[in-house]
Amino acid sequence: MTSVTDHSAHSMERAAEHTINIHTTAGKLAELHKRTEEALHPVGAAAFEKVHAKGKFTARERIYALLDDDSFVELDALARHRSTNFGLGENRPVGDGVVTGYGTIDGRDVCIFSQDVTVFGGSLGEVYGEKIVKVQELAIKTGRPLIGINDGAGARIQEGVVSLGLYSRIFRNNILASGVIPQISLIMGAAAGGHVYSPALTDFVVMVDQTSQMFITGPDVIKTVTGEDVTMEELGGAHTHMAKSGTAHYVASGEQDAFDWVRDVLSYLPSNNFTDAPRYSKPVPHGSIEDNLTAKDLELDTLIPDSPNQPYDMHEVVTRLLDEEEFLEVQAGYATNIVVGLGRIDDRPVGIVANQPIQFAGCLDINASEKAARFVRVCDCFNIPIVMLVDVPGFLPGTEQEYDGIIRRGAKLLFAYGEATVPKITVITRKAYGGAYCVMGSKNMGCDVNLAWPTAQIAVMGASGAVGFVYRKELAQAAKNGANVDELRLQLQQEYEDTLVNPYIAAERGYVDAVIPPSHTRGYIATALHLLERKIAHLPPKKHGNIPL
């Protein structure tokens, strides 16, 4: 029930409005102030209180939390929808449900939009879509990263097909901007229908644990059509899209954590494809590689186990190679048999792609191949050198992998790496067998500098499998003669390992540029990055390659 006090307040507001004389300069300024204030609270303060009660920020608060203080410049703050159907003519909130503009992050210009779930549930209508299209085009034209903060419920049904038309324009702009400017999407609530395709077209997708959901069709529709019972979190929650679908690149513990991750990832990225990622003028070491060895470098000399079948954590290698041991891992919970992420070596941003021996022995499978391929393409788009750390016994065997398309989908990594023109450096730490050796940054796939540790095992296959092929007849004859076949097999395996399973055969043929002590790895990579800083590489003229999608 509305109180007498509420009626009095409303009457006073109406009286104040009537006292503004818009025919004077002072009145015009007062009118602007009134409209600007209305844009800040388009549906009233109570709606914001409901958002806060859920532990979430409002659309504007999210922008302020992400950007540098006092840097946000809003665009189209006074826009309103033009629809009159279904009573919308009487309900025209200022801003139409999305806040757009530009500002700075660490002093670098970015364009941004933030969807307002308090206005029509964050649903996209014509003017809402036009605002996003406008800021997308501004980002492309000025060569600035674009950040989208998503919290909306799909198309605005009351506005009909124009909503779908604007979705299509947004998607097309995402595609035109791809590889030109970094595009980052944050999912801060339940995003459904058309709201999920734009984030899927961007470079990085950040979700918030227990807060974010993404799906094309919701649980109710799925229940009706298929009979399946599934919750929103199970269907499209942050961990679902990290561990199962691979759509999410980072799962944040809260909204501020999500904003911090975006600021971090931007620090490794250039503003556009014609510029380089930021550098922070770190002093360059003088003297030889040996002169600059640290205790962390020396730890690498004892990291690889004596047994080739004993795993180790590749993160232990990665962090020791990077400045300040800082590694921004991407998709850490997806396809964990491969590790990808960003770091710096001598202040130069690099992309790391590394097999993970503690998961599937580091084997490549479908998901790992696609995860690595996408990351390689992101690095190539934005002029970030690629460093591969290789310990791979092969592709994961099994009928499931074969039926699901490991041939075609594994070839995506081959294609992505072969097409990349950025500096490419490979370090083989241990196993590099068969076709997986070729895929993981081999010299003949176009790698610029190939290094190997003395523990490297570069061969068509491991000793156990090879002996079964090469000495099949000898083993069969030994069995017939009653000899100790197991003892003979071990002897032949040792002979094979001593002869072929090492880095030196590849080094003799130039497939490895240098066999180095593990402790020298960071120094060798740093000098290679310096050498390749102005690398010139050209692909044959073409419209585009036909990657095996």
UniProtKB/Swiss-Prot annotation:
Cellular component terms per the entry's GO annotation: acetyl-CoA carboxylase complex
**EC assignment:** 2.1.3.15, 2.1.3.-
**SUPFAM superfamilies associated with the record:** ClpP/crotonase
Cited Pfam families: Carboxyl_trans (PF01039)
Pathway(s): Lipid metabolism; mycolic acid biosynthesis
Where in this chain does the record put each CoA carboxyltransferase C-terminal domain? 295-542
State the reactions this protein catalyses.
Answer: N(6)-carboxybiotinyl-L-lysyl-[protein] + acetyl-CoA = N(6)-biotinyl-L-lysyl-[protein] + malonyl-CoA; N(6)-carboxybiotinyl-L-lysyl-[protein] + propanoyl-CoA = methylmalonyl-CoA + N(6)-biotinyl-L-lysyl-[protein]
- In this chain the CoA carboxyltransferase N-terminal domain maps to 25-281
Q: Which GO terms describe its molecular function?
A: propionyl-CoA carboxylase activity; transferase activity
Which keywords label this protein?
A: Transferase
Domain of life of the source: Bacteria
In terms of PROSITE patterns, this protein maps to: COA_CT_CTER (PS50989), COA_CT_NTER (PS50980)
Q: Which residues cross the membrane?
A: none
Protein's UniProt keywords contain Transferase = yes
Q: Does the keyword Transferase apply?
A: yes
Described function: Component of a biotin-dependent acyl-CoA carboxylase complex. This subunit transfers the CO2 from carboxybiotin to the CoA ester substrate. When associated with the alpha3 subunit AccA3, is involved in the carboxylation of acetyl-CoA and propionyl-CoA.
Q: Which family does it belong to?
A: Belongs to the AccD/PCCB family.
Tell me the subunit arrangement. The biotin-dependent acyl-CoA carboxylase complex is composed of AccA3, which contains the biotin carboxylase (BC) and biotin carboxyl carrier protein (BCCP) domains, and AccD5, which contains the carboxyl transferase (CT) domain.
Q: What is this protein called?
A: Biotin-dependent acetyl-/propionyl-coenzyme A carboxylase beta5 subunit
| Organism annotation | Mycobacterium leprae (strain TN)
Q: Which gene encodes it?
A: accD5
